[in-house]
Amino acid sequence: MRTLEDSSGTVLHRLIQEQLRYGNLTETRTLLAIQQQALRGGAGAGGTGSPQASAEILAPEDTQVLQQATRQEPQGQEHQGGESHLAENTLYRLCPQPGKGEELPTYEEAKAHSQYYAAQQAGPRPHVGDRDPRGAPGGHRSQDEALRELRHGHVRSLSERLLQLSLERNGARAPSHMSSSHSFPQLARNQQGPAPRGPPAEGPEPRGPPPQYPHVVLAHETATAVTDPRYRTRGSPHFQHAEVRILQAQVPPVFLQQQQQYQYLQQPQEHPLPPHPAVLSHGPLGALSPPEVEGPASTQTSSAPSGSAHLAQMETLLRENARLQRDNERLQRELESSAEKAGRIEKLEGEIQRLSEAHESLMRASSKREALEKTMRNKMDSEMRRLQDFNRDLRERLESANRRLASKTQEAQAGSQDMVAKLLAQSYEQQQEQEKLEREMALLRGAIEDQRRRAELLEQALSNAQGRAARAEEELRKKQAYVEKVERLQQALGQLQAACEKRELLELRLRTRLEQELKALRAQQRQAGTPTGASGGSPELSALRLSEQLREKEEQILALEADMTKWEQKYLEERAMRQFAMDAAATAAAQRDTTLIRHSPQPSPSSSFNEGLLTGGHRHQEMESRLKVLHAQILEKDAVIKVLQQRSRKDPGKATQGSLRPAKSVPSVFVAAAAGTQGWQSLSSSERPADAPARLATDRAPEEEPVAAAPLPAHAKHGSRDGSTQTDGPTEGASACLGLDPDSLLGYSGGQRTASLDSVAASRVQDLSDMVEILI
């Protein structure tokens, strides 16, 4: 609806603009009143007036024409509304108020009229006849420019029907106004014959212009030549324009008369020549004058005896011409206004058609909307009725549910009271039972504490018994170790006693054999000394010498036996101490193992695996350490064996002594051990210088040959290690006596000699290994 109001307001505005351009003052006032009323009525509603209101205010004849005509859209003239309104106001102020049936001038006429009055008020203008016809004064330059623009303007051509209607209505008053129309040449041919009105002019006949001065009308001379009958062509399209009409109609009569008289007096008094052809071709206003003007001109040239008669005739002609011109202009204005009204009516019809179509579309849309609203209202009513029924059912259900709930709550309250009484009785009974159970639990806790104390006492007694058992086991192991030691010592003692007995037997046999050999040697010496009588004192000397040597050797043997017993005692003590230390270490390790096993946690797969790894690592380390110890022992024993082998190679060369008397109380094993020990000690101790040549001599002598008795060194007595005895001679004497070569003394065979040497070497190695272990 807003768009319809806007469009109606736009249509009214266009109508007012067109009426201001082309209509009369009455219709303009009517449309302005309609617009003002629409503006006052639409100020509250926010829009312009409706087309119905504007149509009601129009005149009745306008409404009839509005219903029959069609609308024509304006051709780009909407922007001239303000200018046309201003021109209309100016025209209303300048022109007198016309009557009811009088036509008002158009916008272009009012504009030209206002320009004319502005020029009159600006200052005195030069007379039109005072200037040259060919000149171009500056006073009429604005009118010339307006005419120049009119040449390029649009020419309004009317339809034949409208022209015939206007001619039928106004044909009696203006029969000669269409004489020279270019649009309707048949009218011009029919109206060329009427005679001029008015009395025939008296006086001399006026002459026309000379042939060398053609009637050429320029554009700037149009304003002065408009009222001249020679230059008027009413059918020309240029004279049909509004500005030309305003110049023809609105010039004051006094000014026109003065101008016409001045022009007429200045014309030459000659007969008019036929019009030059150039007159028709120069300028838009160059056309033939009408016959009613040409007639008086011919009469003026023929008969004008005096100037006054001529002037009177001219005045009558001018008045008639002005009257005809006014009638023609009025008819033209009526024709133009009717054409403009027809165009406006067409535009109004088109706009009304468009408004009616919009109204019909709006009505259809509103009918559709109303139908849709009706259907939606019906749907909503049905939905509301359905919801009301549903709400009623729900309310009934709610009431029934509330009633049932109230009855149930009452029943539940009664049942709950009974249940509460029962629960109270049950809770009292349960409290009594709970008190009984608590007393029983207190008794059981006391019994459990007694049981726990008893268990602790039993565990303590068990731990004490286990400790006593462990200590008893340890003591038992120690006693068993002592028993084993005693048994081993007894076995060793028995073995030593057996060895001593065997050694004593061997020594007895050797002693007896040596005594026998000694006796044999003495007998040989006697037999050898008898032949030589001269040397009677030599046997005595040899006997004394031998007795001294024997005594020295016995002393040496005694000293060696003492040393041997001392070292044997030390060896036994050291061996016993070593055995005791080994047993103590074994018992400590066993006890440690038992404590570890006892205090170890319960075995688990992971802990057993870790313990297996740890025990394996410990065993591996123990084996490595044991291997290292054994390797060191082997190296030491190898070194001792090498030393003993060297000494054994040296010992046989020193066994060059006579018969020895071994001690009966010294076992043979101890002798061998003492000999080995003495030989081993002799490596570290410093030997006497006197023993060096004897040892070197024995080293050079071969083992197979019998060695003769070496000369005895000087007696250099020195104390032994323990200081018990004093011996003369080197300490190697015992080993030499124990390691005597059987071939040199007893004459044994080679096999017996090697067997005895092997047994002596084996005993030495065994004893030395034991001594090295003890010392380590």
Curated annotation (Swiss-Prot):
Comp. bias (Polar residues): 177-192, 297-306, 678-687
Main location: other
Cellular compartment(s): Recycling endosome; Cytoplasm; Cell projection, Podosome; Cell junction
Positions of region (Disordered): 41-88, 119-142, 169-215, 283-309, 591-620, 677-743
Residues in coiled coil: 314-509, 543-570
Region ranges (Required for interaction with CDH5): 101-307
Positions of the record's site feature: Required for interaction with MAGI1 and ACTB: Y107
Assigned protein family: Belongs to the angiomotin family.
Protein name per its UniProtKB record: Angiomotin-like protein 2
Organism: Canis lupus familiaris (Dog)
Gene: AMOTL2
